Amino acid sequence: MAPKKDVKKPAAAAAPAPAPAPAPAPAPAKPKEEKIDLSAIKIEFSKEQQDEFKEAFLLYDRTGDSKITLSQVGDVLRALGTNPTNAEVKKVLGNPSNEEMNAKKIEFEQFLPMLQAISNNKDQGTYEDFVEGLRVFDKEGNGTVMGAELRHVLATLGEKMKEEEVEALMAGQEDSNGCINYEAFVKHIMSI
């Protein structure tokens, strides 16, 4: 008898090697922060206005050196009738760190172009913009929003307000059902 041949089972087809993982998508580039060149801003305020602004500026000087910290700039801007967001204030300051906000100081001459830049910004919301924004919360379509819901929105969304600020803003605005006529509310806010 002939010797048995080793019958080998055909080798199982090797599984195809997994395709290499695709290269990770490059991280999206951060949008370049627009720098505001304060030296290029033309001061359009009258001498009298500048004197009034300086007087207000100096009220915030805590050390008597005719300077304020960067963290006070937003307060002074708002005291002078502008209404910049915190982001706009940081942008006009050159996006300083939190440490710099409390440590760095500026003089009135450095502040004035910042005030002019903020004053020139025409991106402020209009009455219609605010009413339209609040209409989203008008579930019944009757011109009112729930006071509790508005409190929550003001304290948690966008430029968050402190609870005391919300209460001061909403004082006397709610009806007996806890609802607020948002058109009257916007008129009230814009008159402050």
Curated annotation (Swiss-Prot):
Keywords (A to Z) from UniProt: Acetylation, Methylation, Motor protein, Muscle protein, Myosin, Phosphoprotein, Repeat
Modified residues annotated as N,N,N-trimethylalanine in this record: A2
Region Disordered, annotated ranges: 1-34
UniProt PTM: Isoform MLC3 is acetylated at position 2.
Entry GO CC: contractile muscle fiber; myosin II complex
InterPro entries cross-referenced by the UniProt entry: CALM/Myosin/TropC-like, EF-hand-dom_pair, EF_hand_dom
Domain EF-hand: 48-83, 125-160, 160-192
Annotated CDD domains: EFh (cd00051)
Superkingdom to which the source organism belongs: Eukaryota
Modified residues (Phosphoserine): S71, S97
Residue ranges with Pro residues bias: 17-29
Sites of Phosphothreonine modification: T69, T85
A GO term, aspect molecular function: calcium ion binding
Quaternary organization: Myosin is a hexamer of 2 heavy chains and 4 light chains. Does not bind calcium.
Function: Non-regulatory myosin light chain required for proper formation and/or maintenance of myofibers, and thus appropriate muscle function.
Protein name: Myosin light chain 1/3, skeletal muscle isoform
Naturally occurring in which organism (per UniProt): Oryctolagus cuniculus (Rabbit)
Lineage: Eukaryota, Metazoa, Chordata, Craniata, Vertebrata
